[in-house]
Amino acid sequence: MATLEDKLQELLQPSVEDLGCELWGIECQRSGRFFTVRLYIDKKDGGVTVDDCADVSRQVSAVLDVEDPIADKYNLEVSSPGLNRPLFTLKQFENYIGQDISVHLRVPMLDRRKWQGKLEKIENDMLTLIVDNQPQVLVFGNIQKANVVPKFN
């Protein structure tokens, strides 16, 4: 069964691409009676500007008003992924092999939900993180949330 995020990705991706941006990912979050739809956009040829976010917000709002895929009232947020960019797809993870990432699991592994380490490799939906000099194999489907850990020199 497709999630709301999957449905929104399919619905909104063409509109975002028409504006010269990539739809990096979508988060839907409920906090009390408020519902937030957060879109992360990126550009291959440089950084995302405030104008890019405003243009995407206007375009996406129009599509959502017509298609009406969200039953509740919601707030729409559009931003760049930022330095600690969230990772949503295996392809995105592949781009960060050799870098530190932080992962939150749906179901604990070895009594831990939170893991941080160097992403060593990806094979058959399995990610290998080096944590405290030990390889830890995580199942992609068990990842609730993941982010790149920025390095500051």
UniProtKB/Swiss-Prot annotation:
Superkingdom of source: Bacteria
Family annotation (SUPFAM superfamilies): YhbC-like, C-terminal domain, YhbC-like, N-terminal domain
GO cellular component: cytosol
Cellular localisation: Cytoplasm
One Pfam family, short name: DUF150_C
Keyword Cytoplasm: yes
BP GO annotations: ribosomal small subunit assembly; translation
Swiss-Prot/TrEMBL keywords: Cytoplasm, Ribosome biogenesis
Principal cellular location given in the protein's record: cytoplasm
Function: Required for maturation of 30S ribosomal subunits.
UniProt family annotation: Belongs to the RimP family.
NCBIfam families associated with the record: PRK00092.1-1
The protein, known as: Ribosome maturation factor RimP
Species in which this protein is naturally found: Histophilus somni (strain 129Pt) (Haemophilus somnus)
Lineage: Bacteria, Pseudomonadati, Pseudomonadota, Gammaproteobacteria, Pasteurellales
Gene name of the record: rimP
